[in-house]
């Protein structure tokens, strides 16, 4: 019996066309952020982000390693959705000008004397 095989074909033109279409539905001054967590959902973080960089205003990433990888070739806004949990990670985020998601009051207080941009995660019961 043959092993089943799988093939993943990434059509960059379709991804780009989808972004262009979605943006056409928005007001012209609306910002558009690409969420590319988990290696762009398994499609290849660097391949996808380099291919759409001219179409997006920024990126939402989970892991610090992914964010630093994308920062190597873009100066656009990068939101580190996981946040940071150590002083070393905070320094990397600060030096790379990442925005951070704040998940709890301890993180909020830790960043209160910093000029780093933060986004507040507010859980309304839907996670």
Positions of predicted regions on the chain:
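Structured alpha-helical segments in the cores of large, soluble enzyme domains
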Residues: 18-25
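Active-site-proximal beta-alpha core segment in soluble small-molecule metabolic enzymes
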Residues: 2, 6-10, 14-17, 30-127
């Amino acid at each position: 019996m043959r092993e089943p095989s799988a093939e993943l074909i990434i059509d960059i033109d379709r991804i780009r066309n989808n972004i262009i279409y979605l943006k056409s539905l928005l007001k012209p001054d609306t910002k558009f952020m690409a969420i590319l967590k988990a290696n762009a959902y398994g499609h290849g973080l660097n391949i996808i982000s380099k291919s759409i960089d001219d179409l997006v205003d920024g990126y939402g990433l989970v892991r610090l390693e992914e964010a630093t990888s994308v920062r190597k070739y873009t100066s656009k806004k990068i939101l580190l959705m996981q946040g940071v949990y150590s002083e070393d990670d905070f320094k990397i985020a600060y030096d790379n000008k990442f925005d951070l998601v704040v998940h709890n009051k301890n993180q909020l207080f830790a960043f209160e004397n910093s000029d780093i941009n933060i986004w507040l995660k507010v859980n309304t019961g839907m996670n």
